């Protein structure tokens, strides 16, 4: 396995660990999710280019479209939560609290 693939896997792992550790603020969770999506995009693009599998060449573009939709929804939710509660804590998203 080359160093490029190892670095991309390390970036994905670090983003996943960051998502698991810093899940109290919504902004840090969104940044970690974006890091995970970016590393998945780069990994998918490199895999398709290295195997010359042209039938799946649209997969990274579709992944980027879903990542952009996820980012837009996440930022809209962040703005709504910060305007309503004044903070970006994820615990404010719990609908079961009184």
UniProtKB/Swiss-Prot annotation:
Keywords: Electron transport, Membrane, Mitochondrion, Mitochondrion inner membrane, NAD, Respiratory chain, Translocase, Transmembrane, Transmembrane helix, Transport, Ubiquinone
Main location class: mitochondrion
Catalytic reactions of this protein: a ubiquinone + NADH + 5 H(+)(in) = a ubiquinol + NAD(+) + 4 H(+)(out)
UniProt-listed Pfam families: Oxidored_q2
Residue pairs linked by disulfide bridges in the UniProt entry: none
Membrane-crossing segments per the record: 1-21, 29-49, 61-81
A GO molecular function held by the record: NADH dehydrogenase (ubiquinone) activity
Gene Ontology CC entries for this record: mitochondrial inner membrane; respiratory chain complex I
One GO-annotated biological process of the protein: ATP synthesis coupled electron transport
InterPro entries per UniProt: NADH_UbQ_OxRdtase_chain4L/K (IPR001133), NUOK/Mnh_C1-like (IPR039428)
UniProt key word Transmembrane: yes
Mode of membrane association: Multi-pass membrane protein
Gene3D superfamilies per the UniProt record, alphabetical: 1.10.287.3510
Family according to the record: Belongs to the complex I subunit 4L family.
Subunit structure: Core subunit of respiratory chain NADH dehydrogenase (Complex I) which is composed of 45 different subunits.
Protein name: NADH-ubiquinone oxidoreductase chain 4L
Organism: Vicugna pacos
Gene from which the chain derives: MT-ND4L
């Amino acid at each position: 396995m080359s160093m490029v693939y190892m670095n991309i896997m390390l970036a994905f792992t670090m983003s996943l660990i960051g998502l698991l550790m810093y899940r109290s603020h919504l902004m840090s969770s969104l940044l970690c999710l974006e890091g995970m999506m970016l590393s998945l995009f780069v990994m998918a693009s490199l895999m398709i280019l290295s195997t010359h599998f042209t039938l799946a060449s649209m997969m990274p573009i579709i992944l980027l479209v879903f990542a952009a939709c996820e980012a837009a929804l996440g930022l809209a939710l962040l703005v709504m939560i910060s305007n309503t509660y004044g903070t970006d804590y994820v615990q404010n998203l719990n609908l079961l609290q009184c």
